[in-house]
């Protein structure tokens, strides 16, 4: 496909749905919150482990995430998707959210995995915003990185210019889709952030 919009939109509607089995786990974080993890494990208890990072407002139900998890498990990998805060099935406890430059939760989680599975290779793959987070983490860790391998998929390296693009022409389709998802996500977070951001649900949903 040579058209970037067709390449982006078609898989959303025509890619086969992957019904991947998984188990959810809540991992408590040092600041008193939690990270929700979706585990998909093979029968081999010593299988190499791959961490999957979703994109902006994605989650375990994102088609690209499930597709990657199914493909990796088929190859014998243990797979775990790390939800960014407030992208999970339950609302996080703290007002803190996530962004493309925040690597703290990823670093904490990978260190946790390294302690839990000291002899198993650990890899990571990040999509879109998750790719931004992963790339920044790799740059921060450099030669001390505990990962054996990593892949960054479709990450908007220049976020400023990418933001400008989605404000124009067909890009507005993506802007509306992402903004609607972000507003719904923030709406369920209102009780936690009302002191920091005094906004009503009605005001929030009118943001465009």
Language-model regions, residue ranges each:
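Short beta-to-alpha linker loops that shape the active-site pocket of alpha/beta-hydrolase fold enzymes
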Residues: 78, 83-87, 156
